Amino acid sequence: MELLSTPHSIEINNITCDSFRISWAMEDSDLERVTHYFIDLNKKENKNSNKFKHRDVPTKLVAKAVPLPMTVRGHWFLSPRTEYSVAVQTAVKQSDGEYLVSGWSETVEFCTGDYAKEHLAQLQEKAEQIAGRMLRFSVFYRNHHKEYFQHARTHCGNVLQPYLKDNSGSHGSPTSGMLHGVFFSCNTEFNTGQPPQDSPYGRWRFQIPAQRLFNPSTNLYFADFYCMYTAYHYAILVLAPKGSLGDRFCRDRLPLLDIACNKFLTCSVEDGELIFRHAQDLILEIIYTEPVDLSLGTLGEISGHQLMSLSTADAKKDPSCKTCNISVGR
């Protein structure tokens, strides 16, 4: 049987967090003969390995020949924000069950995308299921080392400047390494209604009245839901003043929440004043997208311990947790 030509001119497009479309060129004489495609897909950082996050999944994918371009989809071997290399081979299945194969094409590289809004909406729905009842609170707070606040006073005009979010949480979160903001907490102890006296982030705490960051002029976005191999679950929310750079970033990427009616964090008018509530059963991580003036709040030392084991800095999400994972790339 006549040999097959080697595929060439590979094109990759329509890339998502767990799929891509691929096409290539081959000789006209092969178009009606080819019965199968072999696709060799490897993580770029380890091209010679067949190890993906789940074992025993081959990187050489076999597909029946279909008109090109074709979509390759699968959350079991594709992860978000991950660089891959891909090469293709065409084949004709013969009567004896063996394959006549072409040579391998050139190798091309691409990077998968972030979670889209519909994926984040699925995470949001999962988070809502365990959020629990809403508790009142009155302040947002940020813990850090004393030197951090001294630096803000001395070198930053008494202002906490936004910084780039780390890679904690879901690997596919569009905020990781992209969104600038200042991290705050708002969870309270159910028996006192006050912020806890322990913190993983430092013994010095800046507290600011909730209405300074969260009010009807602020948009609230859902950004992530994750855990770190423990029973605790975290939800990341973004507070962005309407029309700000942070707001424009989030508008196209994150689900927008109704500030007065959602399962995580609310601001509503009751008897003429703003009342704030947070979900009891989630640890909320709040990202405020603008600079925060220290003069708007108070700074003091907490009496509790610094619980480093609870820090979420660059924390990796547990990919096996059924509570906080969805069926797309982790």
UniProtKB/Swiss-Prot annotation:
<dbReference type="Pfam" id="PF19281">
    <property type="entry name" value="PHYHIP_C"/>
</dbReference>
<dbReference type="InterPro" id="IPR045545">
    <property type="entry name" value="PHYIP/PHIPL_C"/>
</dbReference>
<protein>
    <recommendedName>
        <fullName>Phytanoyl-CoA hydroxylase-interacting protein</fullName>
    </recommendedName>
</protein>
<dbReference type="GO" id="GO:0005737">
    <property type="term" value="C:cytoplasm"/>
</dbReference>
<comment type="function">
    <text>Its interaction with PHYH suggests a role in the development of the central system.</text>
</comment>
<dbReference type="InterPro" id="IPR003961">
    <property type="entry name" value="FN3_dom"/>
</dbReference>
<feature type="domain" description="Fibronectin type-III">
    <location>
        <begin position="6"/>
        <end position="115"/>
    </location>
</feature>
<dbReference type="InterPro" id="IPR013783">
    <property type="entry name" value="Ig-like_fold"/>
</dbReference>
<comment type="similarity">
    <text>Belongs to the PHYHIP family.</text>
</comment>
<keyword id="KW-0325">Glycoprotein</keyword>
<feature type="glycosylation site" description="N-linked (GlcNAc...) asparagine">
    <location>
        <position position="325"/>
    </location>
</feature>
<comment type="subunit">
    <text>Interacts with PHYH and ADGRB1.</text>
</comment>
<dbReference type="InterPro" id="IPR036116">
    <property type="entry name" value="FN3_sf"/>
</dbReference>
<dbReference type="GO" id="GO:1990782">
    <property type="term" value="F:protein tyrosine kinase binding"/>
</dbReference>
<dbReference type="InterPro" id="IPR042868">
    <property type="entry name" value="PHYHIP/PHYHIPL"/>
</dbReference>
<feature type="glycosylation site" description="N-linked (GlcNAc...) asparagine">
    <location>
        <position position="14"/>
    </location>
</feature>
<dbReference type="GO" id="GO:0008104">
    <property type="term" value="P:protein localization"/>
</dbReference>
